[in-house]
């Protein structure tokens, strides 16, 4: 009986072991990934708690922030260079207009044209600079007070240019009008003196 039981047990174990292995493999497939995920999560938490790793991450974030600041500064400088180029062209056109304004009547008309050209350059440069500030404020890392300050500086520069041109044109117009009046009065005086001399000559001839 003992031998029969031993033979039956060995045969059953032979049939049961392969079946148990087949059942065990898919179960382990679904069980092992969560275990690995938990293990990775614990390792990651331990790495985050490590002060050396946290310092390295802080240094990396600070480095990226410095790069962003450098890019924003370069962008601001490029926009300022664009505005200054437009303003310089406006001043150049204004200077040519000043030179042409004092030449003659034709030069005066050309001077007005150059003044208008200078105003277009100054106004377009200022408007494009302010628009770029408002649209790219976040990329330039500028706060609202800084944007308002830049806008006030650009507007004041354009206003000073307009005041200078207006005062110069007005003063030249006044001087030109005075010169024309003096010439007319001088011509009148010279004509009157000629008439007076003619009268004197006539009176002298009658006396003789």
Curated annotation (Swiss-Prot):
**Membrane topology term:** Multi-pass membrane protein
Domain of life, source organism: Eukaryota
The UniProt gene name for this protein comes to tmem160
Q: Where is the composition biased (Acidic residues)?
A: 181-192
Q: Which InterPro entries match?
A: TMEM160
Record carries keyword Transcription regulation = no
Q: Where is the transit peptide?
A: 1-45
Species: Danio rerio (Zebrafish)
PANTHER family in UniProt: TRANSMEMBRANE PROTEIN 160 (PTHR16236:SF0)
Give the stretches traversing the membrane. Answer: 82-102, 110-130, 147-167
Q: Which family does it belong to?
A: Belongs to the TMEM160 family.
Keywords per UniProt: Membrane, Mitochondrion, Mitochondrion inner membrane, Transit peptide, Transmembrane, Transmembrane helix
Q: Does the keyword Transmembrane apply?
A: yes
Residue ranges of region Disordered?
181-208
Q: Where in the cell is it found?
A: Mitochondrion inner membrane
Principal localisation:
mitochondrion
Q: Which protein is depicted?
A: Transmembrane protein 160
Q: Which segments show compositional bias classed as Basic and acidic residues?
A: 194-208
One GO cellular component this record assigns the protein to is: mitochondrial inner membrane
């Amino acid at each position: 009986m003992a031998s029969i039981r031993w033979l039956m047990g060995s045969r059953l174990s032979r049939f049961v072991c392969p079946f148990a292995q087949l059942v065990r493999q898919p179960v382990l497939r679904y069980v092992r990934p969560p275990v690995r995920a938990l293990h990775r999560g614990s390792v990651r938490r331990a790495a985050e708690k490590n002060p050396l790793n946290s310092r390295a991450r802080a240094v990396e974030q600070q480095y990226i922030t410095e790069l962003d600041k450098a890019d924003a500064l370069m962008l601001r400088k490029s926009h300022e260079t664009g505005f200054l180029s437009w303003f310089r062209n406006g001043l150049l056109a204004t200077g040519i207009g000043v030179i042409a304004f004092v030449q003659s009547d034709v030069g005066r008309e050309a001077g007005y044209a150059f003044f208008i050209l200078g105003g277009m350059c100054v106004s377009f440069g200022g408007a494009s600079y302010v628009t770029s500030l408002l649209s790219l404020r976040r990329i330039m890392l500028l706060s609202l007070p800084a944007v308002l300050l830049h806008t006030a500086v650009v507007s004041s520069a354009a206003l000073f240019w307009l005041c200078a041109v207006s005062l110069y044109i007005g003063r030249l117009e006044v001087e030109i009008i005075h010169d024309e009046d003096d010439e007319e009065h001088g011509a009148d005086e010279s004509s009157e003196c000629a008439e007076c001399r003619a009268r004197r000559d006539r009176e002298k001839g009658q006396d003789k």
